[in-house]
UniProtKB/Swiss-Prot annotation:
Any one annotated GO CC term: nucleus
GO biological process, one term: tRNA dihydrouridine synthesis
Record GO terms (molecular function): flavin adenine dinucleotide binding; tRNA dihydrouridine synthase activity; tRNA-dihydrouridine16 synthase activity; tRNA-dihydrouridine17 synthase activity
Protein name, per record: tRNA-dihydrouridine(16/17) synthase [NAD(P)(+)]-like
Species whose genome carries this gene: Homo sapiens
Family affiliation: Belongs to the Dus family. Dus1 subfamily.
Keyword Chaperone in annotation: no
Residue ranges with Basic and acidic residues bias: 341-351
Xref: Pfam families: Dus
PANTHER family hit by this protein: TRNA-DIHYDROURIDINE SYNTHASE, TRNA-DIHYDROURIDINE(16_17) SYNTHASE [NAD(P)(+)]-LIKE
Endpoints of the signal sequence: none
Length: 473
């Protein structure tokens, strides 16, 4: 069967998918993809896989792809990060039988991508990207796609997209933020950039960014003219986003845990998903956050989920008919998380610094930060009052705390240098240079003297050759 391209690939292989779950490291595993598909997702991506590791490590291939596929999980696109055309194609050839397309990650803005020289940090190396896409387009039996971030300039972003299309990219996902927009500096994604790309290329385009609810999806499709909309963080906080529903947080948690029992994944993935899904509820029930962080088994997590459900249902029964106050709805329903801006973040950090200063000045559990109060619950015998902590005198030579029982009144490092130089002992630091030297000398004196070999007497056989000569004679 000939390889489908462009709009034919999107309409037939991807079945005209409009609702797309993004590739998310340690978060878009099989169990989560299946949950998302049950609630309106029409296309999913695997987590980003490292092409070089995928080529050399059979266990990595098995754990991250070969054992992570099933018939219900289609259509599926496998995403790789890579910076070498040959390695990218080798990895893609090993993966192409398990998916419907191969995606090249050109959008990751994280520091690990900068150190590894991949993701959004390749967006200025157009010659390299052309070679990677062209070779993959020639060698693979499935289409190659790309996920990119925009440049600040719309015209440069358009030329970038056209270059990838010309090289052989069959579908483009455009995240409407630059690589500098991340974390507290994320800001809003530019749909204007996405719209300009869509008008300039003749392949399908997916939009990514600013998607928190179904109304955002519909507005993005209308305003940009793209073929589909991809959600990442919005999907993590509400997997039913594409259905336009906001179900109770425990409902989706229970459904997800049932899928995990059938399709196991690392417990760290499960815990991370529930922290996102329950984000607003855990602000109210902090002790359940502690429990979720501590449990070591899937059944332990299920028990925390059941406890959360009971508490929320009890709260609902007490507030029968009540309406939510403020802009946020009830905490027990799935809802977006609005990331605080840089100003809000700096205020929070300033508040944390002032709290620590207050603790240092006054001490006592009544003024401890929430984090230290949690630590005190875990370590009840540990003191957090600065006034009760032991005070250490400083070493005269380096300023580090000196040993209380050091014979030289120095820290261990300085004491070791001095004791070695003077062949002295410091029992306080366990340094016994003098004692060890004395024991060594005493041992040598106690050994019998080595006997010098005596010359043979005249007329007696002298050595091996002489004795053998006599015997032969």
């Amino acid at each position: 069967m000939p390889k489908l391209q462009g709009f034919e690939f999107w309409s037939r292989t991807l079945r005209g998918a409009r609702h797309v779950v993004a590739p998310m490291v340690d978060q878009s595993e099989l169990a989560w993809r299946l949950l998302s598909r049950r609630h309106g997702a029409q296309l999913c991506y695997t987590p980003m896989l490292h092409a070089q590791v995928f080529v050399r490590d059979a266990n990595y291939r098995k754990e991250n792809l070969y054992c992570e596929v099933c018939p219900e999980d289609r259509p599926l696109i496998v995403q790789f990060c890579a910076n070498d055309p040959e390695v990218f194609v080798q990895a893609a050839l090993l993966a192409q039988d398990y998916c419907d397309a191969i995606d090249l990650n050109l959008g990751c803005p994280q520091m690990i991508a900068k150190r590894g020289h991949y993701g959004a940090f390749l967006q200025d190396e157009w010659d390299l990207l052309q070679r990677m896409i062209l070779l993959a387009h020639e060698k693979l039996s499935v289409p190659v796609t790309c996920k990119i971030r925009v440049f600040p300039e719309i015209d440069k972003t358009v030329r970038y997209a056209q270059m990838l299309e010309k090289a052989g990219c069959q579908l483009l996902t455009v995240h409407g933020r630059t690589k500098e927009q991340k974390g507290p500096l994320s800001g809003a994604a530019s749909w204007e950039h996405i719209k300009a790309v869509r008008k300039a290329v003749a392949i399908p385009v997916f939009a990514n960014g600013n998607i928190q609810c179904l109304q955002d999806v519909e507005r993005c499709l209308r305003d940009t003219g793209v073929q589909g909309v991809m959600s990442a963080e919005g999907n993590l906080h509400n997997p039913a986003l594409f259905e336009g529903r906001s179900p109770a947080v425990w409902e989706l948690a229970e459904e997800y845990l049932d899928i995990v029992r059938e399709h196991p994944c690392p417990l760290s993935y499960v815990r991370a998903h529930l922290f996102k899904l329950w984000h607003h509820t855990l602000q109210v029930h902090q002790e359940l956050r502690e429990e979720l962080a501590k449990v070591k088994t899937l059944e332990g997590i299920a028990a925390v989920s059941q406890e959360l459900k009971l508490r929320c249902q009890e709260e609902i029964s007490r507030q029968e008919g009540a309406k939510p106050t403020g802009d946020l709805p009830f905490h027990w329903i799935c809802q977006p998380y609005i990331r605080p801006g840089p100003r809000e973040g700096s205020k929070e950090k300033a508040g944390a610094r002032s709290k620590r200063a207050l603790e240092e000045e006054e001490g006592g559990t009544e003024v401890l930060s929430k984090n230290k109060q949690k630590k005190q619950l875990r370590n009840p015998h540990k003191t957090f009052d600065p006034s009760l902590k032991p005070k250490y005198a400083k070493c005269d030579q380096c300023g580090n705390p000196k040993g209380n029982r050091c014979v030289f009144s120095l820290c261990r490092g300085c004491c070791k240098k001095r004791a070695s130089k003077e062949t002295a002992d410091c029992p306080g630091h366990g340094l016994l240079f003098k004692t060890k030297l004395e024991k060594s000398l005493a041992w040598k004196e106690a050994q019998p003297e080595l006997q010098e070999p005596q010359p043979a007497a005249p007329g007696t056989p002298g050595g091996f050759s002489e004795v053998m000569g006599s015997a032969l004679a």
